[in-house]
Amino acid sequence: SSGMYGQLNMLIKNIFNSAEESKVIKENPSKTICARGGKPAKRREALTDEQTAILLDSIRELPPYVFVMIGLYAGLRREEILGLKWDCVFLDEKTPYISVRRAWHVEGGEPVVNTLLKTPAAKRDVPIPKCLVACLKEAREKSESEYVISNSKGTVLTETQFVRVWKYITVRSTAERCYYTYVNGQSIKHRIKPRLGEHQPNNPKLVYTMDFKVTPHMLRHTYITNLIYKGVDPKTVQYLAGHENSKTTMDIYAKVKYNKLEELSSVVNAAFGLR
């Protein structure tokens, strides 16, 4: 991101400036490095309450349902959900919670689950609401695996298997898609734009119910956004989200809390004692 680029740029220049002043090097090679660079950070989008309800109704009883529920109501990262085992899910406690202690990784093309989390702050205990408790209790009764999310063999999902699971969501969206036909050895590209409420031609039971995009990270961003909307303080949000850097939390907080002109106006007037 551009923010990371700026930090690295400053660090590199400080190192070479010190080296030049100490006569370690004759000339500072970092003088010509541009101060601007990096890619702008992607704008994070959260699902609305209506979109959340549509998503859950669309995939109820389907493979991605439990994954989506954990993302929406516990805010775990994709790798934390895929690496989650039942021994870290405490549903019968007075205050039910998920203990984040493991993460899913791909090494040499194979899935690996270990205790290597994204940051030290990712190790956390997340209390979970009643709707997620009920969902996980039902999933636990049906499960024969040590993993909360597993394949038909009871083992951890591979990257390819996760993509297949997520496809249950993408095929129900109205996003434009392409397919190819081959005529006389020539590849011809076709575009189709499904309409909301229509049935898929090759599968009449499948209905296009979502006119919005959903990604795994959007579930987590929705969780964080909802905490902020409900007035949860930034430090608590930071802990629950497992953010190592408070800046990450505060950036989201500022965008969510003060993204409407009328809200900004009331804050400014209150600060200066105006009505």
Q: Where in the sequence are the language-model features?
A:
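N-terminal core-binding DNA-recognition domain of tyrosine site-specific recombinases/integrases
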Residues: 1-24, 41, 155-161, 179, ...
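Short, basic (Lys/Arg/His-rich) helix/loop patches that form interaction surfaces
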Residues: 2, 57, 61, 74, ...
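Basic, Lys/Arg- and aromatic-enriched nucleic-acid-binding interface segment
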Residues: 2, 6-10, 21, 25-84, ...
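Key DNA-contacting residues within the recognition helix of helix-turn-helix
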Residues: 6, 13, 82, 225, ...
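DNA/chromatin major-groove-contacting recognition/catalytic segments
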Residues: 54-55, 109-114, 230, 251, ...
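C-terminal secondary-structure termini that scaffold catalytic or DNA-interacting sites
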Residues: 93, 108-123, 130-132, 152-153, ...
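Short functional hotspots where side chains directly engage DNA or cofactors
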Residues: 95-100, 149, 215, 226, ...
